[in-house]
Design a protein with these regions (language model features):
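Helix-turn-helix-type domain boundary/helix-start signal
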Residues: 5-6, 41, 70, 173
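Alpha-helical hairpin
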Residues: 7-8, 43, 72, 90
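A short glycine/serine-rich beta->alpha loop
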Residues: 2-4, 61-66, 324
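Residue-level marker of regulatory loop/turn positions in helix-turn-helix DNA-binding domains and
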Residues: 8, 28, 250
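Short alpha-helical segments that sit at the start of domains
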Residues: 1-17
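Intrinsically disordered, acidic Ser/Thr/Pro-rich low-complexity regulatory segments
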Residues: 82-318, 322-347
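N-terminal helix-turn-helix
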Residues: 18-21, 25, 29-85
Length: 347
């Protein structure tokens, strides 16, 4: 919180929070009589009107026209969210729904990733995104090879949460299966417990230092290991649900604006960049309206949280909706879901 937003008097603080809450509930400009009637501020309507004018001068509120009530700005929502983050707790019903969704199910990682945005979209009524674990950050558990035909081998590795990756490796010579098994054993001793990125660097370092120059077995092992792991690249999946739900709001009545927002929510590279920000922050991130890097999302808010394996953040999830979002409910819900995914990956 900056000093300006942190220095509101007690009454103005209470009034601003009440105005934001009323706007979230109604999607209509908020009048002084409306706030005075619905919230116990301890002042009369005339005083409320005067304080709202001061909040407008400070950039927290705006007035569509003279006779209308006032609408909170992005600055007001930022103030509201910064104060919420101190005390928000997940609703009991939301926590129970999340626990029920994930409990007692034996599912693969891909199924969990596909189902999670469906759950978030259902609970929040907004768009929900999940970035699957970044392969580069996942830990290798074991490597294996299967001879397919002459000079062709299937390289496989199992990573965190039983994620399995296969690569077809063309070889310079033919291998028998027992040779491949010995090579897999050697690589497992060296690579198990390393992330994919660390394993790739280890292979590159071994080749560079030419330790395998006069050792055919090690030379073959490094070649096959490198082939199984593959080159570094963008293999991250993003799953999204509820695009239409997020835009089925009073704010979004202009068809062209809706089309632009739908295009933004279909842009994988933009979504990845958005989700990467929460990984870099290593925790919860709330980006409100004009704070979003993508100008197409300037009328939306993003609530995102990263999930981890061990101490490494490997993916993230987010709820995207109008700036007039129910932050009090959605922020703890997103955070709890991310922590639940972390627990699932660890077990």
């Amino acid at each position: 919180m900056n000093s300006e937003t942190n220095s509101l008097s007690t009454r103005r603080h209470a009034l601003l929070l009440a105005t934001v809450q009323e706007f979230i509930a109604t999607a209509e400009p908020v009048g002084s009589q409306q706030v005075a009637a619905h919230y116990s501020l301890g002042v009369r309507s005339a005083m409320v009107r005067s304080m709202m004018a001061e909040l407008e001068e400070s950039g927290f509120l705006t007035q569509p026209h003279v006779s209308a009530g006032r609408i909170p700005t992005d600055k007001a929502f930022r103030y509201y969210v910064d104060h919420l983050l101190v005390s928000s707790r997940i609703a009991f019903e939301d926590r129970a729904q999340i626990e029920l969704h994930y409990s007692g199910r034996s599912r693969g990682l891909d199924d969990v990733m596909r189902d999670t945005p469906k759950l978030l979209a259902l609970l929040t009524g907004q768009a929900a995104l999940v970035m699957a674990p970044r392969l580069e950050a996942m830990t290798i558990e074991r490597v294996s090879f299967v001879r397919l035909r002459e000079r062709q081998v299937l390289g496989m590795f199992v990573a965190t949460a039983d994620r399995v990756e296969n690569r077809l490796v063309e070889t310079d010579r033919d291998f028998k299966q027992d040779e491949l098994d010995r090579i897999a054993g050697y690589l497992n001793e060296s690579l198990a417990g390393r992330t994919l990125d660390e394993a790739r660097r280890w292979i590159e370092r071994e080749l560079k230092e030419q330790r395998a120059a006069y050792d055919q077995f090690r030379r073959d092992a490094l070649a096959l290991g490198g082939g199984a792991i593959g080159e570094k690249g963008d293999r991250t999946e993003v799953y999204i649900e509820g695009r239409v739900k997020a835009l089925d709001q009073p704010e979004f009545t202009d068809p062209e604006r809706v089309r632009e927002l739908l295009r933004a929510l279909d842009d994988k590279s933009a979504l990845l960049a958005l989700l990467e920000r929460s990984i870099q922050q290593n925790g919860l991130m709330v980006s409100i309206g004009s704070e979003n890097y993508d100008p197409r999302l300037a009328c939306l808010s993003v609530i995102a949280a990263s999930y981890a394996t061990g101490s490494e953040s490997v993916g993230s999830l987010a709820v995207v909706g109008p700036v007039r979002m129910d932050y009090d409910r959605v922020i703890p819900l997103v955070g709890y879901t991310a922590r639940t995914l972390t627990r699932l990956l660890e077990h």
